[in-house]
Amino acid sequence: MVVFSKVTAVVVGLSTIVSAVPVVQPRKGFTINQVARPVTNKKTVNLPAVYANALTKYGGTVPDSVKAAASSGSAVTTPEQYDSEYLTPVKVGGTTLNLDFDTGSADLWVFSSELSASESSGHAIYKPSANAQKLNGYTWKIQYGDGSGASGDVYKDTVTVGGVTAQSQAVEAASQISSQFVQDKDNDGLLGLAFSSLNTVSPRPQTTFFDTVKSQLDSPLFAVTLKYHAPGTYDFGYIDNSKFQGKLTYADVDNSQGFWMFTADGYGVGDGAPNSNHISGIADTGTTLLLLDDSVVADYYHQVSGAKNSNEYGGYVFPCSTKLPSFTTVIGGYNAVVPGEYINYAPVTDGSSTCFGGIQSNSGLGFSIFGDVFLKSQYVVFDSQGPRLGFAPQA
């Protein structure tokens, strides 16, 4: 999964959301496969910047130690698992772009022909189709924890994912973009799958692609199967029973803030019996790490030999040779287990024997973020009816 952390500004007092128009056709379900993008040149990853971006995405405070580590580049690495990146092809206007699907935001933004040649070099870019409509006076802007950002104009255009097309879908075309995004040649933008109330277009928020097309689907849901070091899938409109074991366990979603937020009933570390300490958190495919309350994080790393919270590296680190315990989240009586190897995120620098943890503090956010470290172990159903989330171990 590409490390491409996003930030969404939570807008209070949103005005009426503008809906796009789905193409009328028989109800259906379809699967869209992520594609592996071989990285010809080793890609550097600033580990504390990834962490900082995740905190900023939800309005959290980035600790000074994390800021310092991110700015100094003390933990910049090119880990082997990023030899490939896993993105999803989407046809926007007349161009196919490789986008990052993000259940933690509600914007569809893309590299566009409004950027300079140097900014768009190496990227597939959105060119408004002949039938596209520019929304005069409408703008969007995002800002990230490492100081990067993007902004631009808004168009209504055709967007196709798998077997479903939305006409007059809001497309946020980048006209200004920071160098951090320009350098990520494998990613052409983002498709948000949170609730439309979170959309950041001004002066009037727009509907997400999923909210536009869900009336076309057999069921108004999508299911996510992210994989550990392999391409995953997104199923729209149906549940694929072949992709999980046993039965799905559902948790109610509180979408009052626009997120897929749920409450877990407890957690456990390694072979220990899970406790009953509740954890409220957001299921977010656009965040790489698993961010938890300080007490939970400390409990986990207390059982990791040699682990410490490092000011130098901006988070919990440990010897790479250490065998990590699993982390279990209890959801409605179901134990969702993240294997220990998923939590060994990456060496802090090339060739280092110290590794950065995939579990880190949420820095007092007040809720947890169940990012890819967690999601790669589960088949997760995002059901807009309820709304609710369904969980089961991957097959």
UniProtKB/Swiss-Prot annotation:
Note the pro-peptide positions: 21-70
- GO molecular function terms attached to this record: aspartic-type endopeptidase activity
One GO BP annotation is: proteolysis
InterPro entries in UniProt? Aspartic_peptidase_A1 (IPR001461), Aspartic_peptidase_AS (IPR001969), Aspergillopepsin-like_cat_dom (IPR034163), PEPTIDASE_A1 (IPR033121), Peptidase_aspartic_dom_sf (IPR021109)
> What cellular component GO annotations does this protein have?
extracellular region
**Which reaction does this enzyme catalyse, per its entry?**
Hydrolysis of proteins with broad specificity. Generally favors hydrophobic residues in P1 and P1', but also accepts Lys in P1, which leads to activation of trypsinogen. Does not clot milk
Q: CDD domains attached here?
A: Aspergillopepsin_like
Where's the Peptidase A1 domain? 86-392
Q: Which UniProt keywords apply?
A: Aspartyl protease, Disulfide bond, Hydrolase, Protease, Secreted, Signal, Zymogen
Q: What is its EC number?
A: 3.4.23.18
| Stretch forming the signal peptide | 1-20
Protein localization? Secreted
Highest taxon of source: Eukaryota
Question: What residues form the catalytic site here?
Answer: 102, 284
Q: Where are the transmembrane segments?
A: none
Which cysteine-cysteine pairs are annotated as disulfide bonds in the entry? 320-355
Q: Could you give the subunit structure recorded for this chain?
A: Monomer.
Q: Which family does it belong to?
A: Belongs to the peptidase A1 family.
Q: What does this protein do, in the record's words?
A: Secreted aspartic endopeptidase that allows assimilation of proteinaceous substrates. The scissile peptide bond is attacked by a nucleophilic water molecule activated by two aspartic residues in the active site. Shows a broad primary substrate specificity. Favors hydrophobic residues at the P1 and P1' positions, but also accepts a lysine residue in the P1 position, leading to the activation of trypsinogen and chymotrypsinogen A.
Q: What is this protein called?
A: Aspergillopepsin-1
